[in-house]
Each structure stands twice: as C-alpha cells, then as structure tokens.
Amino acid sequence: MRGAGQQPIIVLSQGTKRESGHQVQIGNINACKTIADVIRTSLGPRAMLKMLMDPMGGIVMTNDGNAILREITVKHPAAKSMIEIARTQDEETGDGTTSVIILAGEVMAHAQTYLEQKTHPTLIIKAYRQALEDMIQWSENKFSKTVDITDDAEIAKVVKSCLGTKMISKWMDLAVNISIQAVKTIRVEKAGVREIDIKRYCRIEKIPGGRIEDSQVVKGIVVNKDILHAKMRRRIENPRIVLLDCNLEYKKGESQTSLEIMREEDISAILEQEEQAIRKQCDEIIKLKPDLVFTEKGISDLAQHFLLKAGITCLRRLKKTDNNRLARVCGARVVHDTSDLRDEDVGTKAQLFEVVKIADEYYTYVTAETTTACTVVLRGPSKDVINEVERNLQDSLHVVRNIMINPKLVPGGGALEMALSREIEQQGAKMDGVKKWPYKAIGLALEVIPRTLIQNCGGSTIRKMTELRAIHAQNAENWTFGVDGTSGDLVDMNKLEIWDPLAVRIQVLKTAIETSVMLLRIDDIVSGTKKAVGGEKQEMMPQ
C-alpha cells in the first residue's frame, strides 16, 4: 500500500496472512460442505458407524454426529464453527446433531450459486432470515401435533423414533423405560416452571461386565467407593447422613514452619494437640448421632478410629457433583466446617445405604423411594459398547426432557422438511425481486434430509424424491409423508409412528441457517503469525 509520497505503508506484520473477498466466501462454503460430507452417511436408521482414534490412542465407534466431530481436528475456522454448532445442538436438545451439520452444509452450498452470480451477501442473508421466520411459524402452527405427556406410551413412541438410528435400538424398550423413569424422577416444578436438569441430577454410572439388559435406574446415587474400615457397617436402613466439604484431619499451616524441640515431653504435647483437634471435630459430628458421614476431602486414620468407635460409617473424597446429588436424595445440607453442624443439617430421607460388590469393584448405593435425583447403572460386555450406549442414552434422556417441556411433535423421516420445502416454494412464487431466489433456495436445501435418508438405504434418489415431491404437491393433507429410513420407501409417518420433538427440529433449522448467515457475512480472514518452533524458539530466549 502506498501513500502520497509513493512510500509503502506496511499495516500488517510480515508473518500475517490475509484472505479477502469472494475467495474467503468460497473457502468457507467448501469447508462447510467437506464437514457435512464427513457425516452424511451417519444419518438415519441405516447409518454407518465411524471409527475414530483419539489422541490418547483410544478408539471411538459411533454414528453420533457430535461425537464424531468432537474427535476430528480441523484447521479451517469455518469448519471449527461447524463443529461448534454440533456441540450446541447436542447440549440444547440432545438430538439432531447430524441433521444440523448436513443442513448447514447444504444451505451454504446453495448460497454459492448466488455469490457467483454477484448477488450481494446481504440480500442472501435477508432472504435466509425471512425463510427461517416463516418456517418456524409453519412448524408450530401447521405441521405439528400436541402429545399427552402423562401417557408414557405416547412419549415412548417419540423416543423410539429417536433411538431407531442408534446402536441401542436393539434394546429399545429398555432404553425407553430407563429414559422416561429417569426424567420423571428428576422433574421438579418450581413456581409453575418445570425444571429438568439432566446434567446435574441424573448421573450415568458405567460398570463393565454383565449384559446390557441388566442396566437399570436407581432412585438415589451410586458411587464407586468402599467404606474406609473393614469393621464399619455395610448396610444401614433409614440412615442419618452428614455431608461435609472439609478435611477430617489435622490442619497444616499455610506457611512452612520449623519447631525446635528441647525436651521429650514437648513432642508428646504437640502430638496430643493434633489428636485433640481431630477429636474435637469428631465429637462435633458424633453429637448429632449420624450413621453415615460423607466428605469431599480426606479423613485421617485417627478420625476413622473415633468415628468407628461411635458406630459411624464414613466415606471420603466424593466428587462435588455426587455430594450435591446425595444432598438431594437424603435431604441433608453440605456443611463446610464441623463447628457449623446443626441437627437440621442431618439428612434423614434416604431409606437404604448399602455397599455392593460388582465384579472386582465396590459400589455404594444410597437410595430413597421419593427423590429428585437418580443414577442410571449401565452394564455391557466392553468399554466401547458401554460408551456408545451412554451416548445414545444421553440423547434419549434429552428427547424425553424436550417433550416434557414442550409437548409438540412434528413428523420425522424428512416429512417436515418436505412440507416446509413445498410451503417455501409456494411463498417464493408470490415474492418479487432478487430476494425470491435465495428464499426458494432454502426450500431446495431442506430436501437434503429426505434425500440423504434414501441414499443411506441404497434407494434410487431421483425417482423417490420426484415421487415424494408429487405426493406433497398433490394434497396439503399429505404433510406427514416422508421416507422410511429402514427400507427407503415413502410412508405416512403417522402410520409408522415416527415423530420428533418440535424443539429439536426448530433448533436444527435455527442453528443451521443462523450459522450460514454468520459465515456468509465473513469477507476477510486474517491469520496471525504462528508460534516459533524448535531452533527459532531457543534463539529468541533471553541469554
């Protein structure tokens, strides 16, 4: 760049790389298409599995979109944002991770045509936003039905359509029952608002060995811990429980101190002082007559001795999350210092404490009939199988939660996408100006979902898609027609009982289009200098 005196003005440093204009947009579109192509075959009941090696040398086998992309290392910033949307989709709704990536890739691919025709990105974005608003409105008002959330059989149908594409589909009824039971256990109504916090109050405990059919929901908590002393009780009915967040051992000073001891009896006095401090802590606990003490920190041998003499069973080094879940089960309050313990801090709601040996490990069960925290115990032949079953179960738990919070359903199997595509086609025909073309392009992009389902079944894509378009165009009542993902035939989803939660599909549409809009607005990528490596790094270090 030159100023008035023809002197070059350097704005960016030499190591900085800059790409701008049309080249950047095409690069972003290609990155999105590449990511979409990676997991295109992982959509639907006939989905292929991907085998991935993680950096630690472990193997992941899955067809879960988010799990696949999480293991892939990419350089391109647009590809990174695509991986991010799969994670967002998984956290928000637990399902639709593969769909959202495929749809975003297709929406970006359709934008390329208009960018090459020199259409301004702002016009494309405006049309995309308009299409998104219309689609959300149609999905909620035209193409959805409400489900009765008190009827488990109705919810089960929806969960089955979600799990049909997963590995756990062979144990469908078991997975459905576990999901519904777990979500109903942790459901809490506060001031008319329904709260279902799966992450915090529903833990999945994986125990290798046994059969998948042995998996169950435990109303309470299960932790991989054993009692500290062989003479402590392993089974207590209706226990009084104290939960602590402090050490039951002598507190060491903050700074390093040294003592000079001149007489022998001084050592005894110091040791006596340590013992007194621990005895005081234990007496404060024993005063409340608990049966069980759980702490997040350590318990010294001396403290174990005092508690054992008082007939108290204790466990140490619990995770904070487990302690909070335990507080919900037994009604106790987590106390940070033994001197603050009051009678109301003791939990009495738990009905049974039991230490059980499963395979070579000991597991502690604390259960109650009426509780708002639960643990799903998963069994299976190997670690890989259990990990995949856990991923599938997480998805089905989220599906049940979504239905409980928003009981509206839309047809699966690409039926909703085809119905929306037809509406966009009709609405686009009434529009005028340049905006109508990108608007109608969204309708074409939506067809990627049923098309991919047909492809993954090995069906004839062109013939089936033409047939499906004809069915939807023939009669407005045919909005429930879609693709049977197992056989590749065109079926009424109402008869096949394949329904998705509205929240999932709307989130897919929102995330895919909003990401495309964000990426289309990028016209410049400036990448800074990379860190110096090897010899250069050593040279730069101060002498």
From Swiss-Prot:
One of its GO terms (cellular component) is chaperonin-containing T-complex. It comes from the Eukaryota. Belongs to the TCP-1 chaperonin family. GO terms for biological process: protein folding. SUPFAM superfamilies: GroEL apical domain-like, GroEL equatorial domain-like, GroEL-intermediate domain like. NCBIfam families: chap_CCT_gamma, thermosome_alpha, thermosome_beta. It comes from Caenorhabditis elegans. It is found in: Cytoplasm. Molecular chaperone; assists the folding of proteins upon ATP hydrolysis. Known to play a role, in vitro, in the folding of actin and tubulin. Plays a role in microtubule polymerization. Disruption phenotype: RNAi-mediated knockdown results in severely reduced microtubule growth rate. Keywords: ATP-binding, Chaperone, Cytoplasm, Microtubule, Nucleotide-binding. One of its GO terms (molecular function) is unfolded protein binding. The gene is cct-3. This is T-complex protein 1 subunit gamma.
